[in-house]
């Protein structure tokens, strides 16, 4: 569970979608071919749906069996990310509740923590005893976005290919 991209510097109260749109990851997804046509990132419903960023179907009580299965599989895959964050916070307890007041120091602490986490993973450091449990509600955010058609098409293609 290597951390491949970290974008910091925004208050925790800022909506995830706004932070995404300000990140280099958004620019990569929207303006380059680095992610590739047959690859995508996964996210929870706090994020907008794009062809390169796949989110769950909005559960308005009318999801079909394939859509519900897709949401379960996506949630299961996203839990890898949640466990990685739990490992990061477990290894570096300072990141659980940063009390610094200078934003540059907070950013440096988080990025340094991600680097140290990656070094521990690469050296096979066992972190299980330090981990936090992920949130119980995998889709805690209502999907408030009007998804891009290409994102909807990509998501439906994934649903159609699930066993």
What are these regions, as identified by a protein language model?
Residues 1-163:
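Short, well-ordered secondary-structure "scaffold" segments embedded in the functional core
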